[in-house]
């Protein structure tokens, strides 16, 4: 059984709500990933060997940045599922790539990561693609 979805032709309040859910999901994904990175930076480089898997996993799970990052990521997933209940997956999914656009800037600002020409061009292409799909 196929759930009723709002198509781009049926834009209105329902579509605005769905897009809001998608954008909250994207933002939660970015914030969650940033917190995961902060937590892992505090832990340092890890190796997942058979003998250390459980202890390393426990250290990650009890790291407050990792824990909160995962919680925010999970909350974003709830908003994503709410969006999927309202719109076609083929319409919603490209919006998830907006996280790449936001992440490029956030990683540069928070972690002093370099923005190479290739990353910049790729991010612009993603942004243009999302714009085109949002207009369909």
Predicted regions located by residue number:
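Polytopic alpha-helical membrane proteins, predominantly small-molecule transporters/carriers
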Residues: 2-136
């Amino acid at each position: 059984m196929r759930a009723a979805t709002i198509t781009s032709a049926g834009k209105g309040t329902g579509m605005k709500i769905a897009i809001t859910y998608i954008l909250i999901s994207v933002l939660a994904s970015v914030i969650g990933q940033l917190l995961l990175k902060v937590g892992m930076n505090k832990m340092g480089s890890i190796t997942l060997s058979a003998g250390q898997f459980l202890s390393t996993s426990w250290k990650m799970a009890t790291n407050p940045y990792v824990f909160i990052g995962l919680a925010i990521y999970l909350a974003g997933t709830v908003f994503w599922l709410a969006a999927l209940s309202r719109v076609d997956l083929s319409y919603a999914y490209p919006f998830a790539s907006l996280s790449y656009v936001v992440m490029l800037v956030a990683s540069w600002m928070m972690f002093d990561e370099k923005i190479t020409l290739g990353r910049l061009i790729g991010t612009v292409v993603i942004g243009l693609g999302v714009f085109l799909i949002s207009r369909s």
